[in-house]
Amino acid sequence: RLPRIAGPCVLVIFGVTGVVNFAQGSIVGFGAMLGWWFIGVCGWPWWLALLAVAASSALIGWIINLTTVRPLIKAPPIAALLTTFAASMVLDNLSQILFKADTREYPAPLPTDDLPVGGVRLGTSDAVALGFTIAAMLALWAWLRFGRDGLAVRATAADPDAARQMGIPVTRVQNLSFLLASCLGGVGGIFFGMYAGVISPYSASFTGTVGFIAAAVGGLGSIVGAVAGGFVIGLLEALGIYQFGGSFRDLFIFGAFLLVLLLRPHGLFGSRHTVTSEPMTGTFLGAGRPPRLAWWHWVLLALVAGLAVPLLGGPVLSSVGTQVAIYAIIAVPMTLLAGSTGQVSLGQAAPVAIGAYASALLVMRLNLPFLVALLLAGVIAAVLATLVTLPIWRLDGHYVSMATLALGYIVLSVIRGWDAVTKGAYGLSGIPAPEILGLRLLVAEDHYQLDLVVLAVTLFVVFRIRSSHLGNVLAAVGSDEIASRSLGLRPRGYKALAYALAAFFAGMAGALLAHQYNYLDPTVFTVQMSVLVLTIVVLGGINSPFGAVLGSLALVGLPEALRLAPDVRILLYGIVVIAIIRFLPQGLWTRRA
């Protein structure tokens, strides 16, 4: 049901602005919580709550457009994509602060009678939701086809510049698209709450991603395709849960998405012209160059980080330092992918998870030495992540970034469902501590020193690559893909290579995490980890490896040292991303060229 509503909502905004609105699912979730408040706490009738939620959600959508999309309308769409991702984080955690994180029963304002329809029995809320979906989609189709404002929306979606020259108020049309999509999303949240029976602030946030997948499967640019894609995704989800259980739900949803990308990138009902080129991050987020440090700067930094922190800070500061170092190891090679080649990965938690479980299993099951398992973890993560994503590098547009996000969900689904190997949701426990040359590293100070050595190696390798011929080729691919192709280069192959390098170091970081915390479960490797890594890279400057270290220190070290609550921490991450992309897109450790 929700994919059928969310798909057209995402489609309307994507068509008009060229932006994948990741905040759409959060608007659905916020609408569900508002509906719970109005009906369950305030005692309003359901129809009045429906109107109030529709108006409130429309207002939220207008604010999101005003603060995160409209100011970046002339920037590459990847910038607005990241800010809507950040807006989703802000809205989810604001909802958690306002309504608390508890799961609660959703009020049932409609009768619970079963209605026989063609041999299928539907509850009253099911029938109302189905009727609303059909009516809303028909009304949306008619409005877009025959309405004056609907025609303006279609004209703006086809060519904003031409629409502006014809006198169409493009800014007002973009506002209207956000108001409409957010209104439908909020109302869909109420029906989601009625259907689910129990909700929490995070219950429906996933629907924004599923909505884009439904629209992409059906075909971007086609209302019929978006609805059909929603039905296909909903059917696959139901069949997957019925046959294999809920653990494999995401595998079917995102597996179908990847399959459609490979076989028919423009979707079941879409046309090829809707698959647009990926904007180059180097012209916006990557503007400027990072400052160069003298050799004595590096010596001083090594002394402070390697000696002062463990000696003066003790185990507490060393524990914080291990987390900073691990996230920095993941983020530093991302500067090759996002900074040099101009490709953003939204699922970097996937190779981290692969490396963590691979290293833990190699040591626990095969009794391999830790250092061997550490290197093999990076190799396994790079090979598996690259093999799964290799075909997608021939695609363009938002699809590549979304495919990396899909990989993250697929890996998590496999981990949850492969009980015989990964122990599923129970996780792996008793993972041995790192052991090097017979010396077992048990205390935080030792872990920190080990992580610092791996981080130093990572920085050395990435700096060497950036200053080499390979680094120049990667930068050329990111600067102008068409020109690099005309010179005989293979841009997609080099993008895949940059992704493999980032996955290798991410796998090693996962191995360090596994052996230092002695326990793994799927909740460690959520999309929030991927977003945090991307935030670190953007904050430091996507062309600056050392900036990634500073970003990790700011976004991981400071919140840990200040002991901020998780919801406040993620709220802070979202605000930082929006502020950096809007006001300092080149990052902190970058000077203007």
Regions found by a protein language model. Give the residues of each.
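Membrane-interfacial amphipathic/re-entrant helices at transmembrane-helix boundaries
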Residues: R1-A6, L34, V41-A49, A75-L81, ...
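Single transmembrane alpha-helix segments in multi-pass membrane proteins
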Residues: R1-V41, I63-A79, T171-R172, L176, ...
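Cytosolic-side transmembrane-helix boundaries in multi-pass membrane proteins
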Residues: C9, L98, D102, A158-Q165, ...
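Transmembrane alpha-helical segments in multi-pass inner-membrane proteins
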Residues: G43-A55, N175-L263, A349, L374-L375, ...
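Alpha-helical transmembrane segments within multi-pass membrane transporters and channels
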Residues: G43-A87, L94, A228-I233, E237, ...
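Mid-bilayer segments of alpha-helical transmembrane spans in multi-pass integral membrane proteins
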Residues: A58-I63, T84-D102, D126-A127, I134, ...
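Extracellular/periplasmic helix-loop junction at the C-terminal end of a transmembrane helix
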Residues: L82, M89-G118, Y242-R249, P265-E278, ...
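Helix-loop-helix "hairpin" substructures at the membrane interface of multi-pass membrane proteins
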Residues: R121-I199, I223-A228, P290-A294, L442-D521
